[in-house]
Amino acid sequence: MASEAAQPDAGLWSAGNAFADPPPPYDSLSGRNEGPFVVIDLDTPTDPPPPYSAGPLLSVPIPPTSSGEGEASERGRSRQAAQRAARRARRRAERRAQRRSFGPGGLLATPLFLPETRLVAPPDITRDLLSGLPTYAEAMSDHPPTYATVVAVRSTEQPSGALAPDDQRRTQNSGAWRPPRVNSRELYRAQRAARGSSDHAPYRRQGCCGVVWRHAVFGVVAIVVVIILVFLWR
């Protein structure tokens, strides 16, 4: 029994010593004869890639047309493209010329370089105003119309003799003359200000000489009183 009980303890002791012992030194030549040496190459493959396939739809050959028809169609397309480019260039030049004919404020400049006048242009120019957009430099130099132009436009739109609808209605409804409506607080303030001005009117009428004379008299009386008090104290 004692020997059987001692055997597990000996096994545990030997296992503990086995774990505690250092491993054997690494030998790179020990496993060379056990199997073939494998080399993994991650570079580009040396085999050529598979041939390119265009697919089932593109693999069908397209029958070529005759050389004469192809050249004629190409010439027609190039001629139409040249005509379209010429028309675009012509329209662009016309728009530039129209933009140069107008002043900085979008008004038609006079030939004598006078201040800008109101826009008086032929119908064809006014029709193309939206198409002739200004450039960046012209937009940056854009200025509002002058004060004289604004006053002239307002005077032409509404004459000075004509009255507004509200003014006409007010003149028609007004019968006899009525005094203007005054707020009670404003009336009280005005009366108090008038009363205060009337109370202080004599002093303002006397001027600065009366006030100075009064102060001088008070000063002399005060000096006399002080002298009398000092004399009596001694």
From Swiss-Prot:
What is stated as this protein's family in its record?
Belongs to the herpesviridae UL56 family.
Briefly, what is this protein's role?
Plays a role in the transport and release of virions form the host cytoplasm to the extracellular space. Relocalizes host NEDD4, a cytosolic E3 ligase, to cytoplasmic vesicles.
Q: What is known of its domains?
A: Late-budding domains (L domains) are short sequence motifs essential for viral particle budding. They recruit proteins of the host ESCRT machinery (Endosomal Sorting Complex Required for Transport) or ESCRT-associated proteins. UL56 contains three L domains: the PPXY motifs which are involved in the interaction with ITCH, a member of the NEDD4 family.
Q: What is this protein called?
A: Protein UL56
- Asked whether the keyword Membrane is assigned, the reply is yes
Tell me the InterPro entries matching this sequence.
Answer: Herpes_UL56
Subunit and interaction comment: Interacts with host ITCH; this interaction induces ubiquitination and probably degradation of ITCH. Interacts with host NEDD4; this interaction increases NEDD4 ubiquitination. Interacts with UL11.
Q: Where is this region: Disordered?
A: 1-104, 158-182
Positions of transmembrane segments = 211-231
Q: Name the source organism.
A: Human herpesvirus 1 (strain 17)
Residue stretches of biased makeup (Basic residues): 85-99
Cellular component, GO annotation: host cell Golgi membrane; membrane
Pfam families named among the record's database cross-references: Herpes_UL56
The subcellular localization recorded is:
Host Golgi apparatus membrane
Tell me what topology the record assigns in the membrane.
Single-pass membrane protein
Q: Which residues form a coiled coil?
A: none
Keywords, in A-Z order = Host Golgi apparatus, Host membrane, Membrane, Transmembrane, Transmembrane helix
Q: Does the keyword Transcription apply?
A: no
What's the domain of life for this entry?
Answer: Viruses
- Motif PPXY motif covers 23-26, 49-52, 144-147
